[in-house]
Amino acid sequence: MSNTVSLQFPDGSVREYDASMTGAALAESISKSLAKKAVAYAVDGTVRDLSDPLGASGKVEIITREDPRALELIRHDTAHVLAEAVQELFPGTQVTIGPVIENGFYYDFARNEPFTLDDLPVIEKKMREIIQRNKPFTKEVWSREKAKQVFSDKGESYKVELVDAIPAGQDLKIYYQGDWFDLCRGPHMASTGQIGNSFKLMKVAGAYWRGDANNPMLTRIYGTAFANDNDLQAYLHMLEEAEKRDHRRLGREMDLFHFQEEGPGVVFWHAKGWKMFQNLVSYMRRRLDSHGYQEVNAPQVLDKSLWETSGHWGWYRDNMFKVTVAGDDTDDDRVFALKPMNCPGHVQIFKHGLKSYRDLPIKLAEFGNVHRYEPSGALHGLMRVRGFTQDDAHIFCTEEQMAAECLRINDLILSVYKDFGFEEITIKLSTRPEKRVGSDELWDRAESVMMTVLEQIRQQSNNIKTGILPGEGAFYGPKFEYTLKDAIGREWQCGTTQVDFNLPERFGAFYIGADSEKKQPVMIHRAICGSMERFLGILIENFAGHMPLWFAPVQVVVATITSDADEYAKEAAAKLKAAGLQVVTDLRNEKINYKVREHSLQKVPVILVCGKREAEEKTVNMRRLGSRDQESMTLDEAIARLCEEATPPDLLRLKNAG
């Protein structure tokens, strides 16, 4: 075995090194300044401790604090410091798990008396002390027996359970920070001092051990950490903005929807909210129609045999709502399920009747109501529900048509997002996972096509960021994931394009090829909004409730100053409605400022104020949401202007093109 390794650096240069050299020594050999800034290193994309030996040849990178990958290390290390601080302050507390999550980290603790928000400042202060000590992170590999004995002696029963769960043959890594240690896969930075002080503990919550309600309840402490104070403050400011924009609060203020205990995870839509929902459906329906989709509707309840054939019963049964039927003899003992996905139903529609290669591509779309079980603790307004509407479509095509169809889908998705003001989009290709169906040759072809498509997308637009997610594809094929950035910088994964070799084969779907032989179609799953409910939640928060005029459930309120203007206000409202606008009149005997405040709280885009003078002159005083300005104009002028603004963007393009 060779004692030297060949390392390729980011600039393309290749050098030989002793295999036993550590990452820290490698950084030192390049430059002392780099060694000071280094927090970890990576070989062939795998991040390692600086204390790890090189071991093997590959592409090497020194990771500094400025590298995006360092953020996960900072948060991981901060979680360990949190655990140490808790055990210093509250002896007898057991530590369990503490992973990095999106935008931060958490750690779960077992303690007789749960932590409260009042404990967080004290814990945070102790964490800063530990960081100031600048203790090195060091790693040891223990035997299973030693690990169980040590943690058992410490009274750490949860850690003993974690040790038992680690597969035989896998190293049991123990990381020390000074004298304190924890079971951990790593990697870590060189010392606690490299964490810095740009962190904050955010909240406490209850969490069942291993997410099982039959297990003990633990206390979870959430925190966040960043590479510098500017990033931390920007994040905290974003959270403040997000709280102001919370769609649940705005939903109440705007009278859009509500939830209640008798229907956990399902939406009670009020009239205004349902109007907004229908606006979204109508817009999407027009877009699909113009792109050659056929809208269909498949049953919501189907026999489990269909779900067994599709594979959902085996892969997804625990997340499905099951129904047993106590009917006549033919129905006894049958088990049905509410559909969690639309795809199996669409395959049945495709199979109904013989299809020729000349018929392809066939594009089936549905605004399908689906139901998926989510733990009650995971439910979150419109963003995480149990019953929702999916803007699903499935394109049945030949393998040769796959690239062109993926590009057409991409054009449609980006166009829809642009119409709602989302132009910062990231598209990532998720490639084959370890567990998958289909031959490697089939995956090679599909990934090659989608890689080419991704490159074409990247070249077409400067606003589009692209990337690869190795091993993150569905078991049945590779997929694109579309993530959009909202007005306050948050990212939301919405659209998907997934290639499926599996479902057509499972159901025996085929078309007749040019050679008169049966061929299996490629099936492309496509969603733009994803969950329509969730997309509406995103829109409400993105616009802070101030929806574009064309999308608002109530577009105009005609409000009177005095009763002298009541008849004129009714006449004005009738003309506005006749022009196609969504109008409400407010003739109440209230002061006009009170009316304006109330309708502004409900985020009505335009208020037309009518008094005695306006009634005499056939004018209106226009006030827009968020503006102090008032503009006087004739009623006809107001109607013309508002009708233009209230035209949906897709129809406006058609109008301008004509």
From Swiss-Prot:
<dbReference type="InterPro" id="IPR033728">
    <property type="entry name" value="ThrRS_core"/>
</dbReference>
<dbReference type="InterPro" id="IPR047246">
    <property type="entry name" value="ThrRS_anticodon"/>
</dbReference>
<keyword id="KW-0862">Zinc</keyword>
<comment type="similarity">
    <text>Belongs to the class-II aminoacyl-tRNA synthetase family.</text>
</comment>
<dbReference type="GO" id="GO:0005829">
    <property type="term" value="C:cytosol"/>
</dbReference>
<dbReference type="InterPro" id="IPR002314">
    <property type="entry name" value="aa-tRNA-synt_IIb"/>
</dbReference>
<feature type="binding site">
    <location>
        <position position="394"/>
    </location>
    <ligand>
        <name>Zn(2+)</name>
    </ligand>
</feature>
<comment type="function">
    <text>Catalyzes the attachment of threonine to tRNA(Thr) in a two-step reaction: L-threonine is first activated by ATP to form Thr-AMP and then transferred to the acceptor end of tRNA(Thr). Also edits incorrectly charged L-seryl-tRNA(Thr).</text>
</comment>
<keyword id="KW-0648">Protein biosynthesis</keyword>
<keyword id="KW-0963">Cytoplasm</keyword>
<dbReference type="InterPro" id="IPR002320">
    <property type="entry name" value="Thr-tRNA-ligase_IIa"/>
</dbReference>
<dbReference type="Pfam" id="PF07973">
    <property type="entry name" value="tRNA_SAD"/>
</dbReference>
<dbReference type="InterPro" id="IPR004095">
    <property type="entry name" value="TGS"/>
</dbReference>
<feature type="domain" description="TGS">
    <location>
        <begin position="1"/>
        <end position="64"/>
    </location>
</feature>
<keyword id="KW-0436">Ligase</keyword>
<feature type="binding site">
    <location>
        <position position="525"/>
    </location>
    <ligand>
        <name>Zn(2+)</name>
    </ligand>
</feature>
<dbReference type="GO" id="GO:0004829">
    <property type="term" value="F:threonine-tRNA ligase activity"/>
</dbReference>
<dbReference type="InterPro" id="IPR006195">
    <property type="entry name" value="aa-tRNA-synth_II"/>
</dbReference>
<dbReference type="GO" id="GO:0000049">
    <property type="term" value="F:tRNA binding"/>
</dbReference>
<dbReference type="InterPro" id="IPR045864">
    <property type="entry name" value="aa-tRNA-synth_II/BPL/LPL"/>
</dbReference>
<keyword id="KW-0547">Nucleotide-binding</keyword>
<dbReference type="InterPro" id="IPR018163">
    <property type="entry name" value="Thr/Ala-tRNA-synth_IIc_edit"/>
</dbReference>
<dbReference type="GO" id="GO:0005524">
    <property type="term" value="F:ATP binding"/>
</dbReference>
<dbReference type="InterPro" id="IPR012676">
    <property type="entry name" value="TGS-like"/>
</dbReference>
<dbReference type="InterPro" id="IPR012675">
    <property type="entry name" value="Beta-grasp_dom_sf"/>
</dbReference>
<keyword id="KW-0820">tRNA-binding</keyword>
<feature type="region of interest" description="Catalytic">
    <location>
        <begin position="246"/>
        <end position="548"/>
    </location>
</feature>
<dbReference type="Pfam" id="PF02824">
    <property type="entry name" value="TGS"/>
</dbReference>
<dbReference type="InterPro" id="IPR004154">
    <property type="entry name" value="Anticodon-bd"/>
</dbReference>
<protein>
    <recommendedName>
        <fullName>Threonine--tRNA ligase</fullName>
        <ecNumber>6.1.1.3</ecNumber>
    </recommendedName>
</protein>
<dbReference type="GO" id="GO:0006435">
    <property type="term" value="P:threonyl-tRNA aminoacylation"/>
</dbReference>
<keyword id="KW-0694">RNA-binding</keyword>
<dbReference type="InterPro" id="IPR012947">
    <property type="entry name" value="tRNA_SAD"/>
</dbReference>
<comment type="subunit">
    <text>Homodimer.</text>
</comment>
<feature type="binding site">
    <location>
        <position position="343"/>
    </location>
    <ligand>
        <name>Zn(2+)</name>
    </ligand>
</feature>
<keyword id="KW-0030">Aminoacyl-tRNA synthetase</keyword>
<keyword id="KW-0067">ATP-binding</keyword>
<dbReference type="GO" id="GO:0046872">
    <property type="term" value="F:metal ion binding"/>
</dbReference>
<dbReference type="InterPro" id="IPR036621">
    <property type="entry name" value="Anticodon-bd_dom_sf"/>
</dbReference>
<dbReference type="Pfam" id="PF00587">
    <property type="entry name" value="tRNA-synt_2b"/>
</dbReference>
<dbReference type="Pfam" id="PF03129">
    <property type="entry name" value="HGTP_anticodon"/>
</dbReference>
<keyword id="KW-0479">Metal-binding</keyword>
